[in-house]
Amino acid sequence: MKLILLVGGPRGGLDLFQSLLDNHDEILQFPGIIHINEKLIKILSHKSKEKIAQNFTKEYLSFFDSRKSIIERHYMLGDKKKQFYKVNTKDFIERFILLSKKNYLFKDKLFQNLFLLHMAYNSINNSKKKKLLVINAHSIPYALNFEKLFKGVNYEIIHTIRHPLSAVSSTLKNWLKFKNGVHLKPKELYYNLESIVLGIQKLNKLKKKVYIIQLENLHQKLNLVMLHLCKIYNLKFKKCLRKSTY
């Protein structure tokens, strides 16, 4: 099984791209961002498997009831934007404990726990053999954290970008929608502008394979982009790769 980190450039359509992967039965992922930080490591480090799963469900409430999502629009699904999803936390915890007794794929114990959390979440609905583990790391700092916190775990990166002028324009328009910079503070605005220019360069320093997907191509050449993805990772091309889940 190959591991992919999704890393988004400013206004680069990362959530859109991940939503296109949601229903593919060879892909394993949580429906949203995994914050690669010390808090996650603390959860994964617990000696009790039950505590790991319990603490994870508390930290990522929206994975188990999408109505609790604040940033992503997973509470506005379907044609009428009124649908949502729920996952039974009791079943998830029990499945994680069971999987922990017999599944060993990664040498890194902490990452093994993260992998099994993915398996427990997915196996409730779909138990087919997986070829690709996808983690939405969201931003470059979290990708850098991954390299520090999970040393020895091999991975590749998919980085979504947007035409620089469109990215700057969208960043500024999004910023101006909110009073007093509540949603996007000045330092975050600076980070976005810096990432437009230096983002790919920073990711290349990790010395991993980095694949670039431009948002404009997702809109205009979707079939070509997804066919190329399937060829690289030996996935079956399916219609679900052409339809966002939200």
Residue ranges of predicted features:
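PAPS-dependent sulfation machinery
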Residues: 33-135
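A conserved segment at the C-terminal end of the G1
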Residues: 14-27
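Conserved catalytic segments around the Walker B and adjacent sensor/switch elements
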Residues: 27-34, 211
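Hydrophobic anchor at the beta1->P-loop junction of P-loop NTPases
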Residues: 6
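P-loop (Walker A) phosphate-binding loop of NTP-binding proteins
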Residues: 9
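Pre-Walker A (Motif I) flank of P-loop NTPase domains
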Residues: 1-3
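Conserved beta-strand -> loop -> alpha-helix junction used to position metal-binding or nucleic-acid-contacting
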Residues: 31-37, 163, 243
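PAPS-dependent sulfotransferase catalytic domain
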Residues: 120-242
